[in-house]
Amino acid sequence: MGDDRPFVCNAPGCGQRFTNEDHLAVHKHKHEMTLKFGPARTDSVIIADQTPTPTRFLKNCEEVGLFNELASSFEHEFKKAADEDEKKAAAGPLDMSLPSTPDIKIKEEEPVEVDSSPPDSPASSPCSPPLKEKEVTPKPVLISTPTPTIVRPGSLPLHLGYDPLHPTLPSPTSVITQAPPSNRQMGSPTGSLPLVMHLANGQTMPVLPGPPVQMPSVISLARPVSMVPNIPGIPGPPVNSSGSISPSGHPIPSEAKMRLKATLTHQVSSINGGCGMVVGTASTMVTARPEQSQILIQHPDAPSPAQPQVSPAQPTPSTGGRRRRTVDEDPDERRQRFLERNRAAASRCRQKRKLWVSSLEKKAEELTSQNIQLSNEVTLLRNEVAQLKQLLLAHKDCPVTALQKKTQGYLESPKESSEPTGSPAPVIQHSSATAPSNGLSVRSAAEAVATSVLTQMASQRTELSMPIQSHVIMTPQSQSAGR
Protein backbone atom coordinates (compact mmCIF):
# COMPACT_ATOMS: atom_id res chain seq x y z
CA MET A 1 0.00 0.00 0.00
CA GLY A 2 2.90 2.36 0.80
CA ASP A 3 4.47 1.56 -2.56
CA ASP A 4 1.35 2.72 -4.42
CA ARG A 5 1.38 6.16 -2.71
CA PRO A 6 4.94 7.08 -1.84
CA PHE A 7 4.38 10.88 -1.54
CA VAL A 8 3.28 11.78 2.00
CA CYS A 9 2.02 15.23 3.16
CA ASN A 10 4.33 16.55 5.89
CA ALA A 11 1.81 19.11 7.23
CA PRO A 12 1.15 18.81 11.00
CA GLY A 13 -1.90 16.70 11.65
CA CYS A 14 -2.17 15.51 8.02
CA GLY A 15 -0.72 12.15 6.91
CA GLN A 16 -2.30 11.74 3.49
CA ARG A 17 -0.42 9.93 0.73
CA PHE A 18 -0.52 10.55 -3.00
CA THR A 19 0.49 8.59 -6.06
CA ASN A 20 2.46 11.38 -7.74
CA GLU A 21 4.14 14.63 -6.83
CA ASP A 22 1.58 16.83 -8.61
CA HIS A 23 -1.23 15.66 -6.36
CA LEU A 24 0.95 16.34 -3.33
CA ALA A 25 1.72 19.87 -4.56
CA VAL A 26 -1.98 20.61 -5.04
CA HIS A 27 -2.70 19.29 -1.55
CA LYS A 28 0.05 21.44 0.00
CA HIS A 29 -1.32 24.47 -1.83
CA LYS A 30 -4.69 23.83 -0.19
CA HIS A 31 -2.96 23.84 3.19
CA GLU A 32 -1.36 27.17 2.39
CA MET A 33 -4.68 28.70 1.31
CA THR A 34 -6.46 27.64 4.52
CA LEU A 35 -6.79 30.28 7.29
CA LYS A 36 -5.68 28.95 10.65
CA PHE A 37 -7.22 30.53 13.76
CA GLY A 38 -6.44 27.63 16.04
CA PRO A 39 -4.51 27.54 19.32
CA ALA A 40 -1.23 27.76 17.43
CA ARG A 41 -1.66 31.57 17.12
CA THR A 42 -2.76 32.28 20.70
CA ASP A 43 0.71 33.49 21.64
CA SER A 44 0.62 36.21 18.96
CA VAL A 45 -0.44 39.82 19.64
CA ILE A 46 -4.22 40.34 19.59
CA ILE A 47 -5.29 43.71 18.20
CA ALA A 48 -8.08 45.24 20.24
CA ASP A 49 -11.21 46.32 18.45
CA GLN A 50 -11.39 50.12 18.61
CA THR A 51 -14.45 50.78 16.52
CA PRO A 52 -15.88 54.16 17.69
CA THR A 53 -19.28 53.02 18.85
CA PRO A 54 -21.48 55.38 20.91
CA THR A 55 -21.02 53.28 24.05
CA ARG A 56 -17.23 53.37 23.77
CA PHE A 57 -17.33 57.10 23.01
CA LEU A 58 -19.32 57.81 26.19
CA LYS A 59 -17.01 55.53 28.18
CA ASN A 60 -13.93 57.37 26.92
CA CYS A 61 -15.54 60.71 27.77
CA GLU A 62 -16.18 59.51 31.32
CA GLU A 63 -12.60 58.25 31.68
CA VAL A 64 -11.11 61.51 30.46
CA GLY A 65 -13.47 63.55 32.64
CA LEU A 66 -15.08 65.54 29.86
CA PHE A 67 -18.57 65.33 31.35
CA ASN A 68 -17.30 66.54 34.72
CA GLU A 69 -15.71 69.55 33.06
CA LEU A 70 -18.88 70.33 31.19
CA ALA A 71 -21.03 70.01 34.27
CA SER A 72 -18.92 71.75 36.91
CA SER A 73 -16.00 73.51 35.22
CA PHE A 74 -17.13 76.90 36.48
CA GLU A 75 -17.56 75.66 40.05
CA HIS A 76 -14.29 73.69 39.98
CA GLU A 77 -12.22 76.69 38.91
CA PHE A 78 -13.75 78.93 41.56
CA LYS A 79 -13.20 76.30 44.26
CA LYS A 80 -9.56 76.09 43.26
CA ALA A 81 -9.23 79.87 43.37
CA ALA A 82 -10.98 80.00 46.74
CA ASP A 83 -8.61 77.39 48.18
CA GLU A 84 -5.61 79.36 46.99
CA ASP A 85 -7.08 82.53 48.49
CA GLU A 86 -7.56 80.83 51.86
CA LYS A 87 -3.99 79.55 51.82
CA LYS A 88 -2.54 82.97 51.06
CA ALA A 89 -4.89 84.86 53.39
CA ALA A 90 -2.77 83.96 56.44
CA ALA A 91 0.45 85.24 54.85
CA GLY A 92 -0.36 88.96 55.25
CA PRO A 93 -3.05 91.65 55.05
CA LEU A 94 -4.61 92.44 51.71
CA ASP A 95 -5.69 95.75 50.33
CA MET A 96 -7.75 94.20 47.54
CA SER A 97 -8.13 90.56 46.51
CA LEU A 98 -9.05 89.58 42.97
CA PRO A 99 -10.20 85.98 42.62
CA SER A 100 -10.74 84.52 39.19
CA THR A 101 -14.08 86.10 38.53
CA PRO A 102 -15.38 87.30 35.18
CA ASP A 103 -16.76 90.50 36.68
CA ILE A 104 -15.91 92.41 39.88
CA LYS A 105 -17.94 95.19 41.48
CA ILE A 106 -16.54 97.64 44.02
CA LYS A 107 -18.77 100.15 45.75
CA GLU A 108 -17.95 103.34 47.62
CA GLU A 109 -20.04 106.29 48.68
CA GLU A 110 -21.31 107.64 45.35
CA PRO A 111 -22.01 105.12 42.60
CA VAL A 112 -20.78 105.57 39.06
CA GLU A 113 -21.69 102.83 36.60
CA VAL A 114 -19.57 102.35 33.50
CA ASP A 115 -20.42 100.31 30.42
CA SER A 116 -17.63 98.06 29.24
CA SER A 117 -19.30 96.29 26.36
CA PRO A 118 -19.90 97.15 22.69
CA PRO A 119 -23.28 98.73 21.96
CA ASP A 120 -24.33 96.18 19.39
CA SER A 121 -24.20 93.15 21.68
CA PRO A 122 -27.81 91.93 22.00
CA ALA A 123 -29.13 90.09 25.01
CA SER A 124 -30.51 86.98 23.39
CA SER A 125 -29.23 83.91 25.26
CA PRO A 126 -31.10 83.01 28.43
CA CYS A 127 -28.71 80.15 29.18
CA SER A 128 -26.59 81.78 31.96
CA PRO A 129 -28.80 83.87 34.24
CA PRO A 130 -26.97 86.63 36.14
CA LEU A 131 -26.64 86.73 39.90
CA LYS A 132 -28.17 89.30 42.16
CA GLU A 133 -25.38 91.66 42.94
CA LYS A 134 -24.72 92.47 46.53
CA GLU A 135 -23.02 95.59 47.72
CA VAL A 136 -20.83 95.47 50.83
CA THR A 137 -19.78 98.62 52.69
CA PRO A 138 -16.04 99.03 52.19
CA LYS A 139 -13.69 99.01 55.13
CA PRO A 140 -10.44 100.58 54.01
CA VAL A 141 -7.56 99.37 56.15
CA LEU A 142 -4.47 100.36 54.18
CA ILE A 143 -3.63 103.81 52.94
CA SER A 144 -2.22 102.79 49.60
CA THR A 145 -4.74 101.64 46.98
CA PRO A 146 -3.80 99.74 43.81
CA THR A 147 -3.70 101.58 40.54
CA PRO A 148 -7.08 101.54 38.79
CA THR A 149 -7.15 99.28 35.79
CA ILE A 150 -9.99 98.12 33.61
CA VAL A 151 -9.13 95.08 31.58
CA ARG A 152 -11.16 94.60 28.41
CA PRO A 153 -10.03 91.49 26.53
CA GLY A 154 -9.41 92.32 22.90
CA SER A 155 -9.09 96.07 23.49
CA LEU A 156 -6.08 98.35 23.13
CA PRO A 157 -3.43 98.19 25.92
CA LEU A 158 -2.32 101.17 27.97
CA HIS A 159 0.80 102.90 26.68
CA LEU A 160 1.67 104.68 29.91
CA GLY A 161 5.19 103.45 30.56
CA TYR A 162 4.49 100.25 32.48
CA ASP A 163 3.83 96.64 31.61
CA PRO A 164 0.29 96.30 30.30
CA LEU A 165 -2.04 93.59 31.47
CA HIS A 166 -1.66 90.38 29.56
CA PRO A 167 -5.08 88.96 28.62
CA THR A 168 -5.72 89.72 24.97
CA LEU A 169 -8.00 86.86 24.02
CA PRO A 170 -11.55 87.96 23.05
CA SER A 171 -13.93 87.06 25.85
CA PRO A 172 -17.24 88.41 27.12
CA THR A 173 -15.70 88.97 30.58
CA SER A 174 -14.15 92.11 31.95
CA VAL A 175 -12.33 93.00 35.16
CA ILE A 176 -12.77 96.54 36.48
CA THR A 177 -11.14 97.92 39.60
CA GLN A 178 -11.58 101.17 41.43
CA ALA A 179 -9.71 104.27 40.32
CA PRO A 180 -8.06 106.32 43.08
CA PRO A 181 -7.25 110.03 42.82
CA SER A 182 -4.55 110.86 40.32
CA ASN A 183 -2.01 111.83 43.00
CA ARG A 184 -1.92 108.36 44.59
CA GLN A 185 0.82 105.80 44.12
CA MET A 186 0.26 102.13 43.43
CA GLY A 187 1.22 100.08 46.44
CA SER A 188 2.45 96.57 45.89
CA PRO A 189 0.26 94.23 47.93
CA THR A 190 2.31 92.02 50.18
CA GLY A 191 0.00 89.03 50.12
CA SER A 192 -2.28 89.76 47.18
CA LEU A 193 -4.07 86.91 45.51
CA PRO A 194 -3.36 86.03 41.88
CA LEU A 195 -5.80 87.41 39.34
CA VAL A 196 -7.15 84.55 37.27
CA MET A 197 -9.32 85.21 34.21
CA HIS A 198 -11.85 82.57 33.25
CA LEU A 199 -12.03 82.40 29.47
CA ALA A 200 -15.03 81.35 27.39
CA ASN A 201 -13.48 78.03 26.35
CA GLY A 202 -13.29 76.80 29.95
CA GLN A 203 -9.60 77.59 30.53
CA THR A 204 -8.08 79.92 33.11
CA MET A 205 -5.35 82.44 32.44
CA PRO A 206 -3.35 84.18 35.21
CA VAL A 207 -3.02 87.94 34.98
CA LEU A 208 -0.04 89.64 36.64
CA PRO A 209 -0.31 93.30 37.65
CA GLY A 210 2.37 95.73 36.54
CA PRO A 211 4.95 97.54 38.69
CA PRO A 212 3.86 100.57 40.72
CA VAL A 213 3.83 103.69 38.57
CA GLN A 214 2.25 107.12 38.73
CA MET A 215 -0.97 107.00 36.69
CA PRO A 216 -2.23 110.22 35.13
CA SER A 217 -5.94 110.73 34.91
CA VAL A 218 -7.43 110.16 31.49
CA ILE A 219 -11.15 110.38 31.97
CA SER A 220 -12.50 112.74 34.60
CA LEU A 221 -15.94 111.86 35.86
CA ALA A 222 -17.49 114.98 37.35
CA ARG A 223 -20.86 113.43 38.05
CA PRO A 224 -22.23 109.95 38.54
CA VAL A 225 -22.81 108.20 35.24
CA SER A 226 -24.77 104.98 34.96
CA MET A 227 -24.75 102.48 32.13
CA VAL A 228 -25.79 98.89 31.71
CA PRO A 229 -23.27 96.60 29.99
CA ASN A 230 -24.41 94.28 27.25
CA ILE A 231 -22.24 91.18 27.10
CA PRO A 232 -22.67 88.96 24.00
CA GLY A 233 -24.56 85.81 24.79
CA ILE A 234 -25.70 86.97 28.27
CA PRO A 235 -28.97 88.83 28.80
CA GLY A 236 -28.48 92.24 30.34
CA PRO A 237 -30.38 93.33 33.44
CA PRO A 238 -33.33 95.70 33.09
CA VAL A 239 -32.65 99.39 33.56
CA ASN A 240 -34.94 101.96 35.14
CA SER A 241 -35.31 105.57 34.12
CA SER A 242 -32.19 106.73 35.99
CA GLY A 243 -30.03 104.01 34.43
CA SER A 244 -29.37 102.04 37.64
CA ILE A 245 -29.76 98.29 37.80
CA SER A 246 -33.04 97.09 39.24
CA PRO A 247 -32.33 94.05 41.40
CA SER A 248 -35.86 92.77 40.97
CA GLY A 249 -35.28 92.07 37.26
CA HIS A 250 -32.62 89.39 37.79
CA PRO A 251 -33.64 85.76 37.30
CA ILE A 252 -33.12 83.20 40.02
CA PRO A 253 -29.49 81.97 40.02
CA SER A 254 -28.61 78.33 39.73
CA GLU A 255 -27.58 76.15 42.65
CA ALA A 256 -23.89 76.13 41.68
CA LYS A 257 -23.78 79.91 41.44
CA MET A 258 -25.53 80.24 44.80
CA ARG A 259 -22.84 78.07 46.42
CA LEU A 260 -20.15 80.10 44.66
CA LYS A 261 -21.64 83.35 45.92
CA ALA A 262 -21.83 82.01 49.46
CA THR A 263 -18.17 80.95 49.31
CA LEU A 264 -17.05 84.35 48.06
CA THR A 265 -19.15 86.16 50.69
CA HIS A 266 -17.60 84.04 53.43
CA GLN A 267 -14.15 84.79 52.06
CA VAL A 268 -14.79 88.55 52.02
CA SER A 269 -16.11 88.51 55.57
CA SER A 270 -13.04 86.58 56.78
CA ILE A 271 -10.65 89.20 55.44
CA ASN A 272 -10.49 92.31 57.71
CA GLY A 273 -9.65 94.76 54.98
CA GLY A 274 -10.15 95.62 51.35
CA CYS A 275 -13.61 95.96 49.95
CA GLY A 276 -16.57 93.65 49.28
CA MET A 277 -16.64 91.89 45.96
CA VAL A 278 -19.58 90.01 44.53
CA VAL A 279 -19.46 88.20 41.24
CA GLY A 280 -21.97 89.38 38.67
CA THR A 281 -21.98 87.17 35.63
CA ALA A 282 -23.94 89.55 33.45
CA SER A 283 -22.76 93.08 34.36
CA THR A 284 -19.87 95.00 35.92
CA MET A 285 -20.38 98.14 37.98
CA VAL A 286 -17.57 100.45 39.05
CA THR A 287 -18.28 103.04 41.73
CA ALA A 288 -16.02 105.91 42.71
CA ARG A 289 -16.18 109.37 44.17
CA PRO A 290 -17.26 112.13 41.76
CA GLU A 291 -14.02 114.01 42.28
CA GLN A 292 -11.88 110.98 41.54
CA SER A 293 -10.53 110.32 38.06
CA GLN A 294 -10.67 106.97 36.35
CA ILE A 295 -8.69 105.27 33.60
CA LEU A 296 -10.85 103.20 31.32
CA ILE A 297 -9.85 100.92 28.49
CA GLN A 298 -13.05 100.52 26.58
CA HIS A 299 -14.15 99.21 23.23
CA PRO A 300 -13.72 101.88 20.52
CA ASP A 301 -17.31 101.42 19.44
CA ALA A 302 -18.76 101.98 22.93
CA PRO A 303 -21.35 104.77 23.15
CA SER A 304 -21.01 107.93 25.22
CA PRO A 305 -21.34 107.23 28.99
CA ALA A 306 -24.16 109.74 29.36
CA GLN A 307 -26.71 107.56 27.58
CA PRO A 308 -28.04 104.49 29.42
CA GLN A 309 -28.74 101.43 27.34
CA VAL A 310 -31.70 99.17 27.78
CA SER A 311 -31.34 95.55 26.82
CA PRO A 312 -33.81 94.60 24.08
CA ALA A 313 -36.49 92.11 24.89
CA GLN A 314 -35.87 88.55 23.92
CA PRO A 315 -37.68 87.52 20.74
CA THR A 316 -40.21 84.78 21.16
CA PRO A 317 -38.95 81.80 19.16
CA SER A 318 -42.30 80.02 19.24
CA THR A 319 -44.02 82.28 16.71
CA GLY A 320 -43.83 79.86 13.78
CA GLY A 321 -44.74 76.91 15.98
CA ARG A 322 -47.81 78.73 17.29
CA ARG A 323 -48.84 79.55 13.74
CA ARG A 324 -48.49 75.91 12.75
CA ARG A 325 -50.45 74.83 15.79
CA THR A 326 -53.29 77.21 14.98
CA VAL A 327 -53.37 75.85 11.44
CA ASP A 328 -53.41 72.30 12.74
CA GLU A 329 -56.10 73.09 15.27
CA ASP A 330 -58.47 74.62 12.67
CA PRO A 331 -59.04 72.02 9.94
CA ASP A 332 -62.50 73.47 9.25
CA GLU A 333 -61.03 76.85 8.38
CA ARG A 334 -58.44 75.23 6.15
CA ARG A 335 -61.14 73.23 4.37
CA GLN A 336 -63.22 76.39 4.03
CA ARG A 337 -60.32 78.18 2.31
CA PHE A 338 -59.81 75.16 0.08
CA LEU A 339 -63.48 75.18 -0.95
CA GLU A 340 -63.37 78.92 -1.60
CA ARG A 341 -60.37 78.50 -3.89
CA ASN A 342 -62.14 75.68 -5.71
CA ARG A 343 -65.27 77.79 -6.17
CA ALA A 344 -63.25 80.70 -7.51
CA ALA A 345 -61.43 78.43 -9.96
CA ALA A 346 -64.73 76.86 -11.09
CA SER A 347 -66.30 80.29 -11.67
CA ARG A 348 -63.30 81.37 -13.75
CA CYS A 349 -63.54 78.16 -15.78
CA ARG A 350 -67.26 78.73 -16.38
CA GLN A 351 -66.64 82.29 -17.55
CA LYS A 352 -64.00 81.11 -20.02
CA ARG A 353 -66.32 78.38 -21.29
CA LYS A 354 -69.16 80.88 -21.75
CA LEU A 355 -66.94 83.17 -23.78
CA TRP A 356 -65.78 80.25 -25.92
CA VAL A 357 -69.34 79.01 -26.53
CA SER A 358 -70.61 82.53 -27.35
CA SER A 359 -67.79 83.03 -29.86
CA LEU A 360 -68.63 79.68 -31.48
CA GLU A 361 -72.34 80.59 -31.68
CA LYS A 362 -71.55 83.94 -33.24
CA LYS A 363 -69.32 82.31 -35.83
CA ALA A 364 -72.00 79.71 -36.61
CA GLU A 365 -74.60 82.45 -37.13
CA GLU A 366 -72.29 84.30 -39.51
CA LEU A 367 -71.62 81.14 -41.51
CA THR A 368 -75.35 80.33 -41.64
CA SER A 369 -76.25 83.78 -42.96
CA GLN A 370 -73.49 83.54 -45.55
CA ASN A 371 -74.76 80.11 -46.62
CA ILE A 372 -78.32 81.44 -46.99
CA GLN A 373 -77.08 84.34 -49.08
CA LEU A 374 -75.13 82.04 -51.38
CA SER A 375 -78.08 79.68 -51.77
CA ASN A 376 -80.30 82.65 -52.73
CA GLU A 377 -77.82 83.71 -55.38
CA VAL A 378 -77.76 80.17 -56.78
CA THR A 379 -81.57 80.16 -56.96
CA LEU A 380 -81.62 83.50 -58.78
CA LEU A 381 -79.06 82.29 -61.29
CA ARG A 382 -81.03 79.12 -61.93
CA ASN A 383 -84.20 81.13 -62.52
CA GLU A 384 -82.39 83.37 -64.97
CA VAL A 385 -81.09 80.36 -66.89
CA ALA A 386 -84.62 78.94 -67.10
CA GLN A 387 -85.98 82.24 -68.40
CA LEU A 388 -83.30 82.38 -71.07
CA LYS A 389 -84.12 78.84 -72.16
CA GLN A 390 -87.80 79.69 -72.37
CA LEU A 391 -87.02 82.79 -74.44
CA LEU A 392 -84.89 80.76 -76.79
CA LEU A 393 -87.61 78.18 -77.24
CA ALA A 394 -90.20 80.90 -77.78
CA HIS A 395 -88.18 82.50 -80.57
CA LYS A 396 -87.53 79.17 -82.20
CA ASP A 397 -90.72 79.35 -84.28
CA CYS A 398 -90.84 83.10 -84.82
CA PRO A 399 -93.75 84.02 -87.29
CA VAL A 400 -91.64 86.58 -89.12
CA THR A 401 -88.94 84.02 -89.84
CA ALA A 402 -91.52 81.45 -90.91
CA LEU A 403 -93.08 84.00 -93.28
CA GLN A 404 -89.73 84.79 -94.88
CA LYS A 405 -89.00 81.11 -95.30
CA LYS A 406 -92.31 80.56 -97.07
CA THR A 407 -92.01 83.51 -99.42
CA GLN A 408 -88.36 83.39 -100.47
CA GLY A 409 -86.90 80.17 -99.05
CA TYR A 410 -83.82 81.80 -97.64
CA LEU A 411 -80.69 79.75 -97.09
CA GLU A 412 -77.11 80.66 -97.71
CA SER A 413 -74.84 78.06 -99.23
CA PRO A 414 -71.35 77.89 -97.66
CA LYS A 415 -69.77 77.20 -101.07
CA GLU A 416 -70.96 80.34 -102.77
CA SER A 417 -70.54 82.49 -99.75
CA SER A 418 -67.55 84.76 -99.67
CA GLU A 419 -67.25 84.23 -95.96
CA PRO A 420 -64.99 81.46 -94.72
CA THR A 421 -66.44 78.17 -93.63
CA GLY A 422 -67.55 78.10 -90.01
CA SER A 423 -68.46 81.79 -89.94
CA PRO A 424 -71.94 82.78 -88.89
CA ALA A 425 -74.41 82.08 -91.65
CA PRO A 426 -76.74 84.72 -92.99
CA VAL A 427 -77.94 87.57 -90.86
CA ILE A 428 -81.60 88.24 -91.33
CA GLN A 429 -82.83 91.61 -90.35
CA HIS A 430 -86.52 91.97 -89.73
CA SER A 431 -88.29 95.21 -89.93
CA SER A 432 -91.83 96.13 -89.37
CA ALA A 433 -93.65 97.13 -92.56
CA THR A 434 -95.92 99.45 -90.67
CA ALA A 435 -93.11 101.33 -88.92
CA PRO A 436 -91.61 104.29 -90.81
CA SER A 437 -87.97 104.02 -91.94
CA ASN A 438 -86.75 106.76 -89.65
CA GLY A 439 -88.94 105.89 -86.62
CA LEU A 440 -86.92 102.90 -85.26
CA SER A 441 -84.74 103.53 -82.30
CA VAL A 442 -81.45 101.91 -81.54
CA ARG A 443 -83.05 99.60 -78.96
CA SER A 444 -85.59 98.24 -81.37
CA ALA A 445 -82.86 97.63 -83.94
CA ALA A 446 -80.81 95.66 -81.42
CA GLU A 447 -83.81 93.59 -80.42
CA ALA A 448 -84.53 92.87 -84.05
CA VAL A 449 -80.94 91.73 -84.64
CA ALA A 450 -81.05 89.45 -81.62
CA THR A 451 -84.34 87.96 -82.65
CA SER A 452 -83.08 87.29 -86.19
CA VAL A 453 -79.96 85.57 -84.83
CA LEU A 454 -82.03 83.29 -82.62
CA THR A 455 -84.37 82.49 -85.47
CA GLN A 456 -81.44 81.68 -87.75
CA MET A 457 -79.98 79.32 -85.21
CA ALA A 458 -83.28 77.50 -84.88
CA SER A 459 -83.85 77.29 -88.62
CA GLN A 460 -80.40 75.84 -89.29
CA ARG A 461 -81.34 72.71 -87.38
CA THR A 462 -84.60 72.17 -89.27
CA GLU A 463 -83.33 72.85 -92.79
CA LEU A 464 -80.11 70.86 -92.81
CA SER A 465 -81.86 67.97 -94.59
CA MET A 466 -83.11 70.17 -97.46
CA PRO A 467 -81.11 70.73 -100.73
CA ILE A 468 -78.41 73.30 -100.20
CA GLN A 469 -79.52 76.56 -101.75
CA SER A 470 -78.41 79.81 -100.35
CA HIS A 471 -79.85 83.20 -101.10
CA VAL A 472 -79.27 86.44 -99.31
CA ILE A 473 -82.35 88.57 -99.17
CA MET A 474 -81.96 92.15 -98.10
CA THR A 475 -85.08 94.19 -97.69
CA PRO A 476 -85.00 97.90 -98.39
CA GLN A 477 -86.39 98.66 -94.93
CA SER A 478 -83.34 97.09 -93.27
CA GLN A 479 -80.98 99.47 -95.06
CA SER A 480 -82.94 102.45 -93.90
CA ALA A 481 -83.06 100.97 -90.40
CA GLY A 482 -79.30 100.47 -90.40
CA ARG A 483 -78.81 104.11 -91.21
Swiss-Prot record:
Intrachain S-S bonds: none
Keyword list, A-Z: Activator, Chromosome, Cytoplasm, DNA-binding, Host-virus interaction, Isopeptide bond, Metal-binding, Nucleus, Phosphoprotein, Telomere, Transcription, Transcription regulation, Ubl conjugation, Zinc, Zinc-finger
Signal sequence residues: none
Chain residue ranges for the region called Essential for binding adenovirus 2 E1A: 325-483
Keyword Zinc: yes
Compositional bias ranges of the Polar residues kind: 429-439
Leucine-zipper: annotated span: 360-388
Annotated localization: Nucleus; Nucleus, Nucleoplasm; Chromosome, Telomere
Region ranges (Basic motif): 334-354
Comp. bias regions, Low complexity: 114-126, 307-320
Phosphoserine: residues carrying this PTM: 413, 423
Annotated GO biological process: negative regulation of transcription by RNA polymerase II; positive regulation of transcription by RNA polymerase II; regulation of DNA-templated transcription; regulation of transcription by RNA polymerase II
Zn-finger (C2H2-type) residues: 7-31
Subunit structure and binding partners: Homodimer; binds DNA as homodimer. Heterodimer; heterodimerizes with other members of ATF family and with JUN family members. Interacts with JNK2; the interaction does not phosphorylate ATF7 but acts as a docking site for other ATF-associated partners such as JUN family members. Interacts (via its transactivation domain) with TAF12 (isoforms TAFII15 and TAFII20); the interaction potentiates the transactivation activity (isoform TAFII20 only) and is inhibited by ATF7 sumoylation. Interacts with TAF4; the interaction inhibits the TAF12-dependent transactivation.
Reported function: Stress-responsive chromatin regulator that plays a role in various biological processes including innate immunological memory, adipocyte differentiation or telomerase regulation. In absence of stress, contributes to the formation of heterochromatin and heterochromatin-like structure by recruiting histone H3K9 tri- and di-methyltransferases thus silencing the transcription of target genes such as STAT1 in adipocytes, or genes involved in innate immunity in macrophages and adipocytes.
Family: Belongs to the bZIP family.
Protein name per the record: Cyclic AMP-dependent transcription factor ATF-7
Organism field: Homo sapiens
